[in-house]
Amino acid sequence: MSIQIPRGTQDILPGTVELWQYIEGQAREICRRYNYKEIRTPIFEHTELFLRGVGDTTDIVQKEMYSFQDRGERSLTLRPEGTAPVVRSYVENKMFGDATQPTKLYYIGQMFRYERPQAGRYRQFVQFGIEAIGSNDPAIDAEVIALAVEFYRGMGLKNIKVVLNSLGDAASRQAHRDALIAHFEPRIGEFCSDCQSRLEKNPLRILDCKKDRNHELMGTAPSITEYLNEDSAVYYDKVQELLTMMDVPFEKDPNLVRGLDYYQHTVFEIMSEAEGFGAITTLSGGGRYNGLVQEIGGPEMPGIGFAMSIERLIMALKAENIELPLEHSIDCYVVALGEKAKDHAAKVAFDLRKAGLSVEKDYLDRKMKAQFKSADRLKAKFVAVLGEDELDKGIINLKDMATGEQEEVALDVFASYVAEKLI
């Protein structure tokens, strides 16, 4: 019996990897333009980090984490999200002492959640995320959202929308929390067991419930906008004003809460409106987390960030029929004819690669026709033919596969000649 891939994971094969590499390259490029620096954290962390950083009332912590005991009886967890590890690194490495605040970081990496696999949702998945830590300026909120929107636009997506809300500061959240408890408590028995347990711990999460979203009490629940104090309302208005100035359209949704406990003030999601995208329309989401650095052991430092699923981005690209400019060709294929030419062909391929070109050659002693077929499949720009006649003359026959033109090139200058033609 053959061993198969675990459920909820996928192999990304040659031919598809190039798409991922292109997306990751574009992510790095936009982060360069916004002056975000890459950070790489461990794939596993101490479980306590996520209990404190994500929140013990969240679905992630209660149902979805891959946790295990190591041989030293330490509880470790494969990271289910990227913000808490980045903040842990920020605190542990004392980045808050850097004079150039805010600290602007990005990551591209694999995350792990035990969820029911479906289209766009895997148990191992890749996130691109950014974190800006150290500023309470609404301009950084707008910048984070604008970066995400510009990235999607740069990928060619047109059918996207930004959904925006504010959860307010700690005082606003507490006032809203009390109102939600008073609203739901008399009829909480009509809700699912998850919502019943959330009532006292984090009633805001009831608004995020998928099972009870059509319950009549959901439509009449107190809105956070009714409980924003003056400072929170001014902050929210400023974020909206800046987004409008940046030509970033958005919709306000007072029921948007996000699934993590650390959010305050700005929260947002970016969704696909493309036909055929599927039921899960959220491409990315994020928000402000002003208490998280302190919760993880650092000084009182505000922060904001977002994370996006690369898998869902690829779904959106397919839904909008977007073809990205991927490079699937090689520069040169070396055809060797006869035993005498084989070793020399290996040297020619080596010299071409040394000159910076992508090169392939035959390793199966096939006839010339079969070797040319391989060159076609690999979309070679040039084919170099080396046989005994060419060796005797000290030349190589070079064919331009786009024009069909052929020429003879001296063997001792061949690599530099082909390199010049391709530059």
Swiss-Prot record:
EC numbers: 6.1.1.21
Keywords: Aminoacyl-tRNA synthetase, ATP-binding, Cytoplasm, Ligase, Nucleotide-binding, Protein biosynthesis
CDD domains: HisRS-like_core (cd00773), HisRS_anticodon (cd00859)
The reaction(s) this protein catalyses: tRNA(His) + L-histidine + ATP = L-histidyl-tRNA(His) + AMP + diphosphate + H(+)
GO MF annotations in UniProt: ATP binding; catalytic activity, acting on a protein; histidine-tRNA ligase activity; transferase activity
GO cellular component terms, A-Z: cytoplasm
SUPFAM superfamilies: Class II aaRS ABD-related, Class II aaRS and biotin synthetases
GO BP terms: histidyl-tRNA aminoacylation
Tagged with keyword ATP-binding: yes
Family: Belongs to the class-II aminoacyl-tRNA synthetase family.
UniProt name for this protein: Histidine--tRNA ligase 2
Organism: Bacillus cereus (strain ATCC 14579 / DSM 31 / CCUG 7414 / JCM 2152 / NBRC 15305 / NCIMB 9373 / NCTC 2599 / NRRL B-3711)
